Amino acid sequence: MEGYWAVLFPVLKVWFSCVIVLIMLPAMFGISLGITETYMKLLIKTLEWATHRIQRASRAEEILKESASNGLIQRDNSSLEQEIEELRRNRPKSADRGDFTLSDVLYFSRKGFESIVEDDVTQRFTSEELVSWNLLTRTNNNFQYISLRLTVLWVVGVVVRYCILLPLRITLTTIGLTWLVIGTTTVGFLPNCRVKNWLSELVHLMCYRICARGLSATIHFHNKQNRPKKGGICVANHTSPIDVVILANDGCYAMVGQVHGGLMGVLQRAMERSCPHIWFERSEMRDRHLVTQRLKDHVNAKTKLPILIFPEGTCINNTSVMMFKKGSFEIGGTIYPVAIKYDPQFGDAFWNSSKYSIMSYLLRMMTSWAIVCNVWYLPPMTHEEGEDAVQFANRVKSTIAQQGGLVDLAWDGGLKRAKVKDSFKEQQQKKYSHMVVGEDSSD
Protein backbone atom coordinates (compact mmCIF):
# COMPACT_ATOMS: atom_id res chain seq x y z
CA MET A 1 0.00 0.00 0.00
CA GLU A 2 2.85 2.36 0.83
CA GLY A 3 4.37 1.65 -2.58
CA TYR A 4 1.07 2.65 -4.22
CA TRP A 5 1.00 6.02 -2.47
CA ALA A 6 4.69 6.51 -3.16
CA VAL A 7 3.91 6.33 -6.88
CA LEU A 8 0.60 8.22 -6.77
CA PHE A 9 1.82 11.35 -4.97
CA PRO A 10 4.61 12.19 -7.45
CA VAL A 11 2.19 11.63 -10.36
CA LEU A 12 -0.40 13.96 -8.82
CA LYS A 13 2.31 16.51 -8.06
CA VAL A 14 3.47 16.55 -11.68
CA TRP A 15 -0.17 16.65 -12.88
CA PHE A 16 -1.12 19.69 -10.80
CA SER A 17 2.15 21.45 -11.59
CA CYS A 18 1.51 21.09 -15.33
CA VAL A 19 -2.09 22.22 -14.96
CA ILE A 20 -1.11 25.31 -12.96
CA VAL A 21 1.93 26.36 -15.01
CA LEU A 22 0.76 25.49 -18.54
CA ILE A 23 -2.97 26.22 -18.34
CA MET A 24 -4.22 27.96 -15.21
CA LEU A 25 -1.69 30.80 -14.86
CA PRO A 26 -1.81 31.76 -18.57
CA ALA A 27 -5.62 31.67 -18.40
CA MET A 28 -5.69 34.03 -15.40
CA PHE A 29 -3.80 36.68 -17.35
CA GLY A 30 -5.53 36.07 -20.69
CA ILE A 31 -2.43 34.53 -22.27
CA SER A 32 -2.44 31.56 -24.64
CA LEU A 33 0.53 29.21 -25.03
CA GLY A 34 -0.97 27.73 -28.20
CA ILE A 35 -2.05 24.43 -26.61
CA THR A 36 -5.76 24.98 -27.29
CA GLU A 37 -5.05 26.21 -30.83
CA THR A 38 -2.98 23.10 -31.63
CA TYR A 39 -5.68 20.84 -30.17
CA MET A 40 -8.37 22.58 -32.24
CA LYS A 41 -6.40 22.25 -35.48
CA LEU A 42 -5.93 18.51 -34.87
CA LEU A 43 -9.60 18.13 -33.94
CA ILE A 44 -10.82 19.95 -37.06
CA LYS A 45 -8.72 17.74 -39.34
CA THR A 46 -9.98 14.61 -37.55
CA LEU A 47 -13.64 15.61 -37.88
CA GLU A 48 -13.13 16.60 -41.53
CA TRP A 49 -11.70 13.14 -42.25
CA ALA A 50 -14.61 11.47 -40.40
CA THR A 51 -17.13 13.60 -42.32
CA HIS A 52 -15.50 12.64 -45.61
CA ARG A 53 -15.74 8.92 -44.72
CA ILE A 54 -19.40 9.26 -43.74
CA GLN A 55 -20.30 11.15 -46.91
CA ARG A 56 -18.47 8.62 -49.07
CA ALA A 57 -20.38 5.77 -47.45
CA SER A 58 -23.74 7.43 -47.87
CA ARG A 59 -23.71 8.83 -51.39
CA ALA A 60 -26.82 6.85 -52.28
CA GLU A 61 -28.94 8.83 -49.85
CA GLU A 62 -28.70 12.21 -48.21
CA ILE A 63 -28.15 11.91 -44.49
CA LEU A 64 -29.78 15.19 -43.63
CA LYS A 65 -30.71 18.38 -45.35
CA GLU A 66 -28.62 21.51 -44.90
CA SER A 67 -29.50 21.52 -41.21
CA ALA A 68 -32.05 20.02 -38.89
CA SER A 69 -33.11 23.55 -38.07
CA ASN A 70 -34.40 23.91 -41.63
CA GLY A 71 -37.00 21.31 -40.67
CA LEU A 72 -38.90 18.55 -42.38
CA ILE A 73 -41.57 20.94 -43.59
CA GLN A 74 -41.08 23.90 -45.89
CA ARG A 75 -43.15 26.72 -44.43
CA ASP A 76 -44.09 30.06 -45.91
CA ASN A 77 -43.75 33.24 -43.88
CA SER A 78 -47.18 34.37 -45.07
CA SER A 79 -49.83 35.52 -42.62
CA LEU A 80 -53.16 33.78 -42.00
CA GLU A 81 -54.95 36.26 -44.25
CA GLN A 82 -52.48 35.87 -47.13
CA GLU A 83 -52.56 32.07 -47.12
CA ILE A 84 -56.35 31.84 -46.98
CA GLU A 85 -56.66 34.40 -49.80
CA GLU A 86 -54.32 32.22 -51.86
CA LEU A 87 -56.65 29.24 -51.35
CA ARG A 88 -59.68 31.34 -52.33
CA ARG A 89 -58.11 32.89 -55.41
CA ASN A 90 -59.85 30.66 -57.95
CA ARG A 91 -63.21 30.71 -56.16
CA PRO A 92 -66.03 32.81 -57.68
CA LYS A 93 -66.94 35.81 -55.55
CA SER A 94 -69.93 35.04 -53.35
CA ALA A 95 -72.84 37.44 -53.23
CA ASP A 96 -73.50 36.64 -49.59
CA ARG A 97 -72.20 38.84 -46.82
CA GLY A 98 -70.49 35.86 -45.21
CA ASP A 99 -67.07 35.07 -46.57
CA PHE A 100 -66.62 31.48 -45.37
CA THR A 101 -65.70 28.77 -47.86
CA LEU A 102 -65.00 25.10 -47.42
CA SER A 103 -61.46 25.64 -48.68
CA ASP A 104 -60.70 27.54 -45.46
CA VAL A 105 -60.80 24.20 -43.66
CA LEU A 106 -57.79 23.08 -45.70
CA TYR A 107 -55.65 25.87 -44.26
CA PHE A 108 -56.41 25.00 -40.63
CA SER A 109 -56.06 21.26 -41.30
CA ARG A 110 -52.66 21.77 -42.92
CA LYS A 111 -51.47 23.93 -40.03
CA GLY A 112 -52.63 21.29 -37.58
CA PHE A 113 -50.81 18.47 -39.37
CA GLU A 114 -47.64 20.59 -39.64
CA SER A 115 -47.68 21.25 -35.90
CA ILE A 116 -48.15 17.54 -35.13
CA VAL A 117 -45.28 16.48 -37.40
CA GLU A 118 -42.90 19.31 -36.56
CA ASP A 119 -43.82 22.60 -34.94
CA ASP A 120 -41.74 25.76 -34.76
CA VAL A 121 -41.56 25.91 -30.98
CA THR A 122 -40.91 22.61 -29.19
CA GLN A 123 -37.99 21.71 -31.46
CA ARG A 124 -36.20 24.79 -30.07
CA PHE A 125 -36.15 23.12 -26.65
CA THR A 126 -34.23 20.03 -27.79
CA SER A 127 -30.65 19.68 -28.99
CA GLU A 128 -29.94 20.64 -32.58
CA GLU A 129 -29.27 17.66 -34.86
CA LEU A 130 -26.09 17.65 -36.90
CA VAL A 131 -25.49 17.46 -40.62
CA SER A 132 -22.65 15.00 -40.05
CA TRP A 133 -21.73 12.89 -37.03
CA ASN A 134 -19.08 14.45 -34.76
CA LEU A 135 -17.98 11.14 -33.18
CA LEU A 136 -19.94 11.71 -29.96
CA THR A 137 -22.19 8.83 -28.88
CA ARG A 138 -24.97 11.21 -27.77
CA THR A 139 -25.33 12.60 -31.33
CA ASN A 140 -25.33 9.24 -33.10
CA ASN A 141 -29.10 9.10 -33.59
CA ASN A 142 -29.08 9.24 -37.39
CA PHE A 143 -25.68 7.72 -38.20
CA GLN A 144 -25.00 4.00 -38.13
CA TYR A 145 -21.91 1.81 -38.51
CA ILE A 146 -19.83 3.06 -41.45
CA SER A 147 -16.42 1.39 -41.39
CA LEU A 148 -13.84 -0.22 -39.12
CA ARG A 149 -11.55 2.82 -39.33
CA LEU A 150 -14.29 5.15 -38.18
CA THR A 151 -15.18 2.79 -35.32
CA VAL A 152 -11.55 2.66 -34.19
CA LEU A 153 -11.36 6.46 -34.35
CA TRP A 154 -14.52 6.71 -32.24
CA VAL A 155 -13.01 4.36 -29.60
CA VAL A 156 -9.81 6.45 -29.51
CA GLY A 157 -11.97 9.55 -29.11
CA VAL A 158 -13.81 8.04 -26.14
CA VAL A 159 -10.49 7.24 -24.45
CA VAL A 160 -9.14 10.75 -25.08
CA ARG A 161 -12.31 12.50 -23.89
CA TYR A 162 -12.95 10.42 -20.77
CA CYS A 163 -9.43 9.46 -19.68
CA ILE A 164 -7.43 12.60 -20.57
CA LEU A 165 -9.69 15.59 -21.18
CA LEU A 166 -12.30 14.85 -18.49
CA PRO A 167 -9.84 14.69 -15.52
CA LEU A 168 -8.08 17.80 -16.81
CA ARG A 169 -11.34 19.73 -17.23
CA ILE A 170 -12.69 18.63 -13.84
CA THR A 171 -9.46 19.83 -12.23
CA LEU A 172 -9.59 23.24 -13.94
CA THR A 173 -13.32 23.76 -13.36
CA THR A 174 -13.05 22.75 -9.70
CA ILE A 175 -10.18 25.20 -9.19
CA GLY A 176 -12.02 27.97 -11.03
CA LEU A 177 -15.31 27.55 -9.15
CA THR A 178 -13.59 27.10 -5.78
CA TRP A 179 -11.56 30.25 -6.26
CA LEU A 180 -14.70 32.09 -7.38
CA VAL A 181 -16.59 31.15 -4.20
CA ILE A 182 -13.64 31.84 -1.88
CA GLY A 183 -12.55 35.00 -3.69
CA THR A 184 -15.97 36.65 -3.93
CA THR A 185 -16.83 35.71 -0.34
CA THR A 186 -13.55 37.20 0.91
CA VAL A 187 -13.92 40.38 -1.14
CA GLY A 188 -17.47 40.70 0.16
CA PHE A 189 -16.17 41.46 3.67
CA LEU A 190 -14.43 44.62 2.45
CA PRO A 191 -16.23 47.98 2.76
CA ASN A 192 -17.68 49.44 -0.42
CA CYS A 193 -14.90 51.30 -2.18
CA ARG A 194 -12.93 51.36 -5.42
CA VAL A 195 -10.51 48.71 -4.17
CA LYS A 196 -13.38 46.31 -3.48
CA ASN A 197 -14.84 46.87 -6.95
CA TRP A 198 -11.44 46.38 -8.58
CA LEU A 199 -10.75 43.16 -6.65
CA SER A 200 -14.24 41.86 -7.43
CA GLU A 201 -13.76 42.42 -11.15
CA LEU A 202 -10.31 40.80 -11.00
CA VAL A 203 -11.60 37.70 -9.19
CA HIS A 204 -14.54 37.27 -11.56
CA LEU A 205 -12.40 37.72 -14.67
CA MET A 206 -9.64 35.31 -13.61
CA CYS A 207 -12.00 32.59 -12.37
CA TYR A 208 -14.20 32.69 -15.47
CA ARG A 209 -11.14 32.43 -17.70
CA ILE A 210 -9.99 29.35 -15.79
CA CYS A 211 -13.47 27.83 -16.14
CA ALA A 212 -13.42 28.55 -19.88
CA ARG A 213 -10.16 26.62 -20.20
CA GLY A 214 -11.87 23.85 -18.25
CA LEU A 215 -14.33 23.55 -21.16
CA SER A 216 -11.66 23.88 -23.87
CA ALA A 217 -13.55 26.98 -24.94
CA THR A 218 -12.44 28.79 -28.09
CA ILE A 219 -14.15 32.19 -28.17
CA HIS A 220 -14.03 34.62 -31.08
CA PHE A 221 -15.05 38.16 -30.10
CA HIS A 222 -16.06 40.54 -32.89
CA ASN A 223 -16.53 44.34 -32.93
CA LYS A 224 -14.96 44.95 -29.52
CA GLN A 225 -15.47 48.68 -29.97
CA ASN A 226 -19.15 48.02 -29.17
CA ARG A 227 -18.51 46.35 -25.82
CA PRO A 228 -21.08 47.26 -23.14
CA LYS A 229 -20.12 50.27 -21.05
CA LYS A 230 -20.80 51.02 -17.39
CA GLY A 231 -24.35 52.08 -16.71
CA GLY A 232 -25.64 50.21 -19.76
CA ILE A 233 -27.71 47.05 -20.23
CA CYS A 234 -26.25 44.11 -22.14
CA VAL A 235 -28.88 41.77 -23.64
CA ALA A 236 -28.02 38.50 -25.37
CA ASN A 237 -29.65 35.33 -26.66
CA HIS A 238 -29.58 32.51 -24.12
CA THR A 239 -28.36 28.96 -24.72
CA SER A 240 -26.92 27.77 -21.41
CA PRO A 241 -25.41 28.91 -18.09
CA ILE A 242 -21.98 28.98 -19.74
CA ASP A 243 -23.14 32.04 -21.72
CA VAL A 244 -22.06 33.93 -18.60
CA VAL A 245 -18.62 32.29 -18.65
CA ILE A 246 -18.23 33.11 -22.34
CA LEU A 247 -19.12 36.80 -22.00
CA ALA A 248 -17.25 37.28 -18.72
CA ASN A 249 -14.01 36.22 -20.42
CA ASP A 250 -13.93 39.64 -22.06
CA GLY A 251 -15.37 41.85 -19.32
CA CYS A 252 -17.28 41.89 -16.05
CA TYR A 253 -21.03 42.26 -15.64
CA ALA A 254 -23.63 42.63 -12.94
CA MET A 255 -26.00 39.75 -13.61
CA VAL A 256 -29.76 39.39 -13.37
CA GLY A 257 -31.35 35.97 -13.20
CA GLN A 258 -33.60 33.37 -11.62
CA VAL A 259 -32.73 32.06 -8.16
CA HIS A 260 -31.35 28.50 -8.34
CA GLY A 261 -30.61 25.81 -5.82
CA GLY A 262 -27.72 23.36 -5.59
CA LEU A 263 -24.35 24.30 -7.08
CA MET A 264 -25.80 27.25 -8.98
CA GLY A 265 -27.31 28.58 -5.77
CA VAL A 266 -23.98 28.40 -3.93
CA LEU A 267 -22.28 30.34 -6.73
CA GLN A 268 -25.07 32.95 -6.83
CA ARG A 269 -24.92 33.64 -3.09
CA ALA A 270 -21.12 33.91 -3.12
CA MET A 271 -21.01 36.22 -6.15
CA GLU A 272 -23.67 38.50 -4.67
CA ARG A 273 -21.38 39.30 -1.73
CA SER A 274 -18.82 41.14 -3.85
CA CYS A 275 -20.87 42.46 -6.78
CA PRO A 276 -24.43 43.87 -7.05
CA HIS A 277 -25.91 40.90 -8.91
CA ILE A 278 -29.70 40.67 -8.84
CA TRP A 279 -31.33 37.27 -8.26
CA PHE A 280 -35.10 36.88 -8.07
CA GLU A 281 -37.89 34.32 -7.92
CA ARG A 282 -39.84 34.58 -11.18
CA SER A 283 -43.09 33.37 -9.61
CA GLU A 284 -43.10 36.13 -6.96
CA MET A 285 -44.80 39.31 -8.19
CA ARG A 286 -43.23 41.30 -5.34
CA ASP A 287 -39.77 40.24 -6.54
CA ARG A 288 -40.53 41.56 -10.02
CA HIS A 289 -41.27 45.08 -8.75
CA LEU A 290 -38.17 45.07 -6.54
CA VAL A 291 -36.01 43.89 -9.43
CA THR A 292 -37.37 46.61 -11.72
CA GLN A 293 -36.56 49.29 -9.14
CA ARG A 294 -33.07 47.90 -8.49
CA LEU A 295 -32.38 47.79 -12.22
CA LYS A 296 -33.41 51.43 -12.61
CA ASP A 297 -31.19 52.46 -9.70
CA HIS A 298 -28.30 50.46 -11.15
CA VAL A 299 -28.62 52.03 -14.60
CA ASN A 300 -28.81 55.54 -13.15
CA ALA A 301 -25.47 54.98 -11.41
CA LYS A 302 -23.15 55.36 -14.39
CA THR A 303 -20.16 54.04 -12.43
CA LYS A 304 -21.57 50.53 -11.95
CA LEU A 305 -20.87 47.53 -14.17
CA PRO A 306 -23.14 46.95 -17.17
CA ILE A 307 -26.08 44.69 -16.40
CA LEU A 308 -26.20 41.34 -18.22
CA ILE A 309 -29.75 40.16 -19.00
CA PHE A 310 -31.06 37.24 -21.05
CA PRO A 311 -34.55 38.53 -22.00
CA GLU A 312 -35.75 35.16 -23.36
CA GLY A 313 -35.94 33.96 -19.77
CA THR A 314 -34.99 30.37 -20.64
CA CYS A 315 -32.40 28.40 -22.60
CA ILE A 316 -33.02 27.95 -26.34
CA ASN A 317 -31.03 25.50 -28.50
CA ASN A 318 -29.09 28.24 -30.37
CA THR A 319 -30.99 27.80 -33.63
CA SER A 320 -33.36 30.71 -32.95
CA VAL A 321 -34.16 33.71 -30.79
CA MET A 322 -37.54 33.66 -29.04
CA MET A 323 -39.63 36.45 -27.56
CA PHE A 324 -37.78 39.00 -25.43
CA LYS A 325 -39.58 39.93 -22.21
CA LYS A 326 -40.36 43.64 -22.31
CA GLY A 327 -39.31 44.32 -18.70
CA SER A 328 -35.66 44.75 -19.64
CA PHE A 329 -36.60 47.44 -22.15
CA GLU A 330 -38.81 49.51 -19.82
CA ILE A 331 -35.94 50.53 -17.57
CA GLY A 332 -34.46 53.14 -19.86
CA GLY A 333 -30.80 53.61 -20.61
CA THR A 334 -28.71 52.26 -23.45
CA ILE A 335 -29.10 48.69 -24.67
CA TYR A 336 -25.99 46.84 -25.86
CA PRO A 337 -27.12 43.82 -27.94
CA VAL A 338 -24.83 40.77 -28.08
CA ALA A 339 -25.26 37.76 -30.38
CA ILE A 340 -23.81 34.40 -29.28
CA LYS A 341 -23.54 31.52 -31.74
CA TYR A 342 -22.07 28.13 -30.80
CA ASP A 343 -20.65 25.63 -33.27
CA PRO A 344 -22.54 22.36 -32.58
CA GLN A 345 -19.96 20.31 -34.48
CA PHE A 346 -17.60 20.35 -31.48
CA GLY A 347 -20.14 20.09 -28.67
CA ASP A 348 -23.75 20.89 -27.85
CA ALA A 349 -23.81 23.89 -25.52
CA PHE A 350 -27.61 23.85 -25.05
CA TRP A 351 -28.85 23.11 -21.53
CA ASN A 352 -32.13 21.22 -21.56
CA SER A 353 -32.95 22.00 -17.93
CA SER A 354 -36.11 19.87 -17.99
CA LYS A 355 -34.01 16.81 -18.85
CA TYR A 356 -30.60 17.34 -17.24
CA SER A 357 -29.49 18.69 -13.88
CA ILE A 358 -26.68 21.24 -13.84
CA MET A 359 -24.16 18.55 -12.82
CA SER A 360 -25.27 16.22 -15.64
CA TYR A 361 -25.06 19.12 -18.06
CA LEU A 362 -21.52 20.03 -16.95
CA LEU A 363 -20.47 16.39 -17.36
CA ARG A 364 -21.76 16.44 -20.93
CA MET A 365 -19.84 19.65 -21.59
CA MET A 366 -16.63 18.24 -20.15
CA THR A 367 -16.87 15.09 -22.25
CA SER A 368 -17.48 17.01 -25.49
CA TRP A 369 -14.65 17.82 -27.87
CA ALA A 370 -14.67 21.55 -27.17
CA ILE A 371 -16.87 24.63 -26.92
CA VAL A 372 -16.43 26.90 -29.93
CA CYS A 373 -18.46 30.07 -30.26
CA ASN A 374 -18.58 33.49 -31.87
CA VAL A 375 -19.64 36.59 -29.95
CA TRP A 376 -20.70 39.74 -31.80
CA TYR A 377 -20.94 43.05 -29.96
CA LEU A 378 -23.57 45.06 -31.82
CA PRO A 379 -23.93 48.86 -31.89
CA PRO A 380 -25.77 50.31 -28.86
CA MET A 381 -29.50 50.90 -29.29
CA THR A 382 -31.96 53.26 -27.61
CA HIS A 383 -35.70 53.88 -27.70
CA GLU A 384 -36.92 55.55 -30.86
CA GLU A 385 -39.61 58.21 -30.75
CA GLY A 386 -43.10 56.71 -30.49
CA GLU A 387 -41.73 53.20 -29.83
CA ASP A 388 -43.05 51.21 -26.88
CA ALA A 389 -41.12 48.58 -24.90
CA VAL A 390 -42.48 45.63 -26.92
CA GLN A 391 -41.52 47.18 -30.25
CA PHE A 392 -38.08 48.08 -28.91
CA ALA A 393 -37.56 44.53 -27.63
CA ASN A 394 -38.57 43.07 -31.00
CA ARG A 395 -36.19 45.41 -32.83
CA VAL A 396 -33.27 44.38 -30.62
CA LYS A 397 -34.21 40.71 -30.97
CA SER A 398 -34.30 40.94 -34.76
CA THR A 399 -30.86 42.58 -34.80
CA ILE A 400 -29.38 39.77 -32.68
CA ALA A 401 -31.05 37.06 -34.77
CA GLN A 402 -29.81 38.55 -38.03
CA GLN A 403 -26.21 38.86 -36.84
CA GLY A 404 -26.08 35.38 -35.30
CA GLY A 405 -27.78 33.65 -38.24
CA LEU A 406 -30.65 32.59 -35.98
CA VAL A 407 -34.37 32.21 -36.69
CA ASP A 408 -36.39 35.14 -35.33
CA LEU A 409 -39.48 33.73 -33.57
CA ALA A 410 -42.30 35.64 -31.88
CA TRP A 411 -43.15 32.74 -29.55
CA ASP A 412 -42.58 32.93 -25.79
CA GLY A 413 -39.78 30.72 -24.45
CA GLY A 414 -42.01 30.08 -21.44
CA LEU A 415 -43.85 27.53 -23.60
CA LYS A 416 -41.08 25.11 -22.63
CA ARG A 417 -42.99 24.51 -19.39
CA ALA A 418 -46.39 26.16 -19.95
CA LYS A 419 -49.31 25.88 -22.35
CA VAL A 420 -50.17 28.41 -25.03
CA LYS A 421 -52.08 31.33 -23.53
CA ASP A 422 -55.78 31.58 -24.36
CA SER A 423 -55.21 35.17 -25.46
CA PHE A 424 -53.04 33.99 -28.35
CA LYS A 425 -55.70 31.53 -29.50
CA GLU A 426 -58.32 34.27 -29.28
CA GLN A 427 -56.12 36.56 -31.36
CA GLN A 428 -56.04 34.01 -34.20
CA GLN A 429 -59.79 33.45 -33.91
CA LYS A 430 -60.44 37.20 -34.15
CA LYS A 431 -58.32 37.48 -37.27
CA TYR A 432 -60.34 34.79 -39.00
CA SER A 433 -63.70 36.14 -37.80
CA HIS A 434 -62.82 39.54 -39.30
CA MET A 435 -62.21 37.83 -42.63
CA VAL A 436 -65.55 36.03 -42.48
CA VAL A 437 -67.93 38.69 -41.19
CA GLY A 438 -65.93 41.88 -41.66
CA GLU A 439 -64.04 44.31 -39.45
CA ASP A 440 -67.23 45.43 -37.72
CA SER A 441 -67.72 42.04 -36.06
CA SER A 442 -68.16 42.11 -32.33
CA ASP A 443 -65.43 40.66 -30.14
UniProtKB/Swiss-Prot annotation:
Keywords, comma-separated and alphabetical: Acyltransferase, Endoplasmic reticulum, Lipid biosynthesis, Lipid metabolism, Membrane, Phospholipid biosynthesis, Phospholipid metabolism, Transferase, Transmembrane, Transmembrane helix
Entry GO MF terms: 1-acylglycerol-3-phosphate O-acyltransferase activity; glycerol-3-phosphate O-acyltransferase activity
UniProt short sequence motif HXXXXD motif, positions renumbered to this chain: 238-243
Keyword Ubl conjugation: no
Top-level EC class: transferase
SMART domains: PlsC
Residues forming coiled coils: none
UniProt keyword annotation of Lipid biosynthesis present: yes
Subcellular location: Endoplasmic reticulum membrane
UniProt function note: May transfer the acyl-group from acyl-coA to the sn-1 position of glycerol-3-phosphate, an essential step in glycerolipid biosynthesis. Also transfers the acyl-group from acyl-coA to the sn-2 position of 1-acyl-sn-glycerol-3-phosphate (lysophosphatidic acid, or LPA), forming 1,2-diacyl-sn-glycerol-3-phosphate (phosphatidic acid, or PA).
Family of the protein in this entry: Belongs to the 1-acyl-sn-glycerol-3-phosphate acyltransferase family.
Record protein name field: Glycerol-3-phosphate acyltransferase 3-like
Organism: Danio rerio
Chain's gene name: agpat9l
